[in-house]
């Protein structure tokens, strides 16, 4: 996925709340939008090099969107809207071997009390996919979530119901960076999510994790990595 808007560099100063932060741009302290409500405390540290997408649009409080951040030499995409777009694009292009062969690819489709990111249909065969973006990395291991997620637990429960009704169900952890050894649930932050994920897997819900090739104006699906439950 190519980011077509201009990208500029900055230095992270501080986070004000879930949606706003200050970044130094050309020596000026500037308000920017943070497109991720996660904690990101390991990434958004004072002095970190960041990349901002410039979105000129009426009604915006600031034209600057905090799109990427460097953690050492590792470039991480932090926009929480990106994983769905990248994975949907990859399925449509036939890149994802695990989800090839479906005639109809739809996004944001409801099932029960949840709305899943992707619905695939091939005749009578139906597959629901929930995509979770992963930005937390510890010693080369990707983890999710970085904060307790009631919504994430709810999605896993609904995916179990999908499977029980005879359809295919999958949760995909899209790791918004490269050079990852494996993925594992973050039991330290949300032990219940880890329990639900393991239960879902034992009941037939498919669990996948993929890394991404991340550049200063693009992010593309790269490799499937091991999931350690």
UniProtKB/Swiss-Prot annotation:
Matches recorded under NCBIfam families: sfsA (TIGR00230)
PANTHER family listed in its UniProt record: SUGAR FERMENTATION STIMULATION PROTEIN A
InterPro entries: SfsA, SfsA_C, SfsA_N
Protein name: Sugar fermentation stimulation protein homolog
Any one Gene Ontology molecular-function term assigned to this protein's record: DNA binding
Similarity-based family: Belongs to the SfsA family.
């Amino acid at each position: 996925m190519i980011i077509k808007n201009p990208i500029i560099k900055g230095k992270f100063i501080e986070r004000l709340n879930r949606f706003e932060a200050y970044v130094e741009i050309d020596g000026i302290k500037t308000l920017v939008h943070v497109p991720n409500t996660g904690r990101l405390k390991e990434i958004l540290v004072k002095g970190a090099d960041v990349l901002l997408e410039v979105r000129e649009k009426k009604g915006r409080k600031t034209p600057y969107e905090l799109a990427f951040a460097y953690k050492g030499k590792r470039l991480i995409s932090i926009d929480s809207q990106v994983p769905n777009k990248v994975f949907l694009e990859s399925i449509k292009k036939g890149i994802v071997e695990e989800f090839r062969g479906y005639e109809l690819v739809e996004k944001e489709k409801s099932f029960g009390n949840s709305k899943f990111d992707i619905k695939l249909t091939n005749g009578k065969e139906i597959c629901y996919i929930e995509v979770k973006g992963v930005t937390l990395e510890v010693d080369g291991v990707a983890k999710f979530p970085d904060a307790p997620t009631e919504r994430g637990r709810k999605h896993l429960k609904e995916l179990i119901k999908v499977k029980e009704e005879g359809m295919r169900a999958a949760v995909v952890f899209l790791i918004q960076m490269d050079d990852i050894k494996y993925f594992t649930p973050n039991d330290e932050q949300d032990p219940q999510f880890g329990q639900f994920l393991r239960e879902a897997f034992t009941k037939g819900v498919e669990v996948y994790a993929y890394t991404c090739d991340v550049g200063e104006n693009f992010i593309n699906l790269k490799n499937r990595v091991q999931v350690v439950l």
